Each structure stands twice: as structure tokens, then as C-alpha cells.
Amino acid sequence: MFGFNLCVVLVAVFSLSKCSARFVYSCKYPPSQWCSSEDIAAECGVLEQCMKYNSTKAADKVKVSLYYESLCPGCRMFLTSQLVPTLIMLQDIMEIDLVPYGNAQETQAQGKYIFTCQHGEDECLGNMIETCMLNKLGLDAVMVIFCMESGNDVLKSAQPCLGVYRPDVTWDSIMQCVKGDQGNKLMHENAVKTDALNPPHQYVPWITVNGEHTDDLQDKAMGSLFSLVCSLYKGQKPAACTLGLKKNTNNYCMN
């Protein structure tokens, strides 16, 4: 909890009148460690100043990673009714990572990766489109994918959704990635990332929070991701956290 980045900041915050010579001479720690813990801050006579300093620092954002499939009903429900709405309301305290792959299988033939998806070839195409969008559009891809997954037909919605949220990006540029070596490589990276999960995923949507997956975190995320993010954020809670957003989405595609 206690910690800081720059000694210069401490010099500015802690005036000589507050940090008396008596404390400075009795402190065996360098200034770079004064706010590293309450005990050290107290020993060096700067506890009050460290409390004030740390209270002004922005806490780390809560990172939510979603391992999913483009045509899995449970994945679509969680992404559209929980993940993206929560991100919109809590974007100052959370970040997300989308990994389209899920329960797919990967083999290699003639120097290329071949993917077999749980919900057929259409899902493999959807996964690849969303992967290429994430690579090309960055965070802007989230709303395009939200639009796709909200539609009756994910694949038919892809091009119109891109036109709505990123009209400056051509559909041809996305499909060039999808059909080329770049898309194949990116999907392989998703496969490696998914297969490296610890514990291994057993179903999708599979959710990790700050890199961790437990049954309890999964249940809380599926029950109310909004409440979970608010509860885990260690900084000052945004006003939105007092409102609440609850929608249970316990629907899975088993591995």
C-alpha cells in the first residue's frame, strides 16, 4: 500500500519543518523507502506525510481478462450484459483483455496452424475476425465486438459494426489479416495464451481477475462483475460504485 516512484516528490511534499533533523538522522532508510511501509514511515517521522501522499496516488486498475468464443451463447451474454457495460461505467478503474479462442483445438499442417472450433467453422471465422480487430483497433475493437455479439448474426454484423464505430478502417484491411499469415499467427498466440492458463480452463466464458482465476472470482464475476470490480479496486471508489449493476449470467460452454 505504501510506496512511491520519485524521491523528488517526497522532497516537495515533506518540508524541513515536518522532517526534523532528529528524525532524519535517526532514520536508517534512504528517502526512496520512506513510504514503503507504515513502520518505516513512522520510524523516519513521515507517517502523516506518507498517508497524505499515498492517498493522492491512483491505485492500479482492476484487470479483467475474458477467454471466450465468438458464438458461445454464455460468452455472448456475459460480454454484452456484464463486461462491456461495466467497462463503460468503470473505465477509470478497470481494464479488459479479450482472448477469442476458448475450447478450440489447434493442429499444424504445412507450416500453418489449423483451428477446429466448438461451434464450427463460423465460430473459427468469428474468432479470427475479432482477433484481427483487437490487433488493429486496440481498445476501439471492444465496442465493435460488443456490437457484433449483440446482433442476431455475429458474422453478418461484423462489417456494419466496424462501419459504425471505426468508419476510417476498411473491411478489406480486416479480412486481409483474417485470411493471411498475420491472423493465423495471432490466433496461435491466443491458443498459447489460453493453453497456459493455470488452472487450465474447463469452460467458457473463463474469467481471470488481475491474472487470477478461482471458483469464487468466477461466480462473483458472473453474478455481478460491476460489484466485483468496485470491491477489488483499492483506490477511492468512483461515484458509479454506489449505484450498482447486477445481472446474473451463469451460462457456460463446457470444454
UniProtKB/Swiss-Prot annotation:
<dbReference type="GO" id="GO:0005576">
    <property type="term" value="C:extracellular region"/>
</dbReference>
<feature type="signal peptide">
    <location>
        <begin position="1"/>
        <end position="21"/>
    </location>
</feature>
<dbReference type="Pfam" id="PF03227">
    <property type="entry name" value="GILT"/>
</dbReference>
<keyword id="KW-1015">Disulfide bond</keyword>
<keyword id="KW-0732">Signal</keyword>
<dbReference type="GO" id="GO:0016671">
    <property type="term" value="F:oxidoreductase activity, acting on a sulfur group of donors, disulfide as acceptor"/>
</dbReference>
<feature type="disulfide bond" description="Redox-active">
    <location>
        <begin position="72"/>
        <end position="75"/>
    </location>
</feature>
<comment type="subunit">
    <text>Dimer; disulfide-linked.</text>
</comment>
<keyword id="KW-0458">Lysosome</keyword>
<dbReference type="GO" id="GO:0047134">
    <property type="term" value="F:protein-disulfide reductase [NAD(P)H] activity"/>
</dbReference>
<keyword id="KW-0964">Secreted</keyword>
<keyword id="KW-0560">Oxidoreductase</keyword>
<comment type="similarity">
    <text>Belongs to the GILT family.</text>
</comment>
<comment type="function">
    <text>Lysosomal thiol reductase that can reduce protein disulfide bonds. May facilitate the complete unfolding of proteins destined for lysosomal degradation. Plays an important role in antigen processing.</text>
</comment>
<dbReference type="GO" id="GO:0005764">
    <property type="term" value="C:lysosome"/>
</dbReference>
<dbReference type="InterPro" id="IPR003119">
    <property type="entry name" value="SAP_A"/>
</dbReference>
<dbReference type="InterPro" id="IPR004911">
    <property type="entry name" value="Interferon-induced_GILT"/>
</dbReference>
<dbReference type="GO" id="GO:0002376">
    <property type="term" value="P:immune system process"/>
</dbReference>
<dbReference type="GO" id="GO:0045454">
    <property type="term" value="P:cell redox homeostasis"/>
</dbReference>
<protein>
    <recommendedName>
        <fullName>Gamma-interferon-inducible lysosomal thiol reductase</fullName>
        <ecNumber>1.8.-.-</ecNumber>
    </recommendedName>
</protein>
<keyword id="KW-0391">Immunity</keyword>
<dbReference type="GO" id="GO:0016667">
    <property type="term" value="F:oxidoreductase activity, acting on a sulfur group of donors"/>
</dbReference>
<feature type="glycosylation site" description="N-linked (GlcNAc...) asparagine">
    <location>
        <position position="54"/>
    </location>
</feature>
<keyword id="KW-0676">Redox-active center</keyword>
<dbReference type="Pfam" id="PF02199">
    <property type="entry name" value="SapA"/>
</dbReference>
<dbReference type="GO" id="GO:0071425">
    <property type="term" value="P:hematopoietic stem cell proliferation"/>
</dbReference>
<keyword id="KW-0325">Glycoprotein</keyword>
